Amino acid sequence: MQVILLEKIQKLGDLGDLANVKAGYARNFLIPRSKVKPATKTNLAKFKLIKAELQASEAKILKNAQVIESKMTGTVCTIQANAGEEGKLFGSINTSDIQISLAASGFEVEKRNINMPETIHHTGKYEISVDLHTDITVSIKVVIEGFQEA
C-alpha cells in the first residue's frame, strides 16, 4: 500500500515522502496514529496544499527538541533505592523510575522515549539515552544510590 508520510518516520522517510508499506501496518498502526494518509489522488492534492504548514510545525517541534537537548545535556539523575550491603537492589530501576526522576528535574519525557538496554539491578552510574525527536538523542547519566532500611 502506498502512503504519504505526515511526519518523519525512521526507516520509511521524511515528511511528504511516498512510501510503500504493508496494508496491515498502514491500517492498524500508521493511519490511526495520524502518521500517514493513503496515497490517493485527492489526498495527494490536499497534501500539496498543507505541506508548508506541516513542514513549519515539524521545524518548530525540532527547534523545541534542540532547546531541550541543550538543557538536558550533562543532566545527572540521582535515584535512591533500597539496596543490600553489596549494592544489589531490592527490586529494579526501569524507565518509569527514570521518567519520574527526569520530571522532578523539570524534563517531561515519555517513558517510551527512554532507551535502556536492560533494567538496573545494582547501585552505580549508568549512561541512558533519551530520544527527544527522530533526529535528536541525548545521553544522560543516572546514578543509583542505595540505602538500607533499619
UniProtKB/Swiss-Prot annotation:
GO terms for cellular component: ribonucleoprotein complex; ribosome. InterPro entries: Ribosomal_bL9, Ribosomal_bL9/RNase_H1_N, Ribosomal_bL9_bac/chp, Ribosomal_bL9_C, Ribosomal_bL9_C_sf, Ribosomal_bL9_N, Ribosomal_bL9_N_sf. It comes from the Bacteria. GO terms for biological process: translation. GO terms for molecular function: rRNA binding; structural constituent of ribosome. SUPFAM superfamilies: L9 N-domain-like (SSF55658), Ribosomal protein L9 C-domain (SSF55653). Keywords: Ribonucleoprotein, Ribosomal protein, RNA-binding, rRNA-binding. Belongs to the bacterial ribosomal protein bL9 family. Binds to the 23S rRNA. This is Large ribosomal subunit protein bL9. It comes from Ruthia magnifica subsp. Calyptogena magnifica.
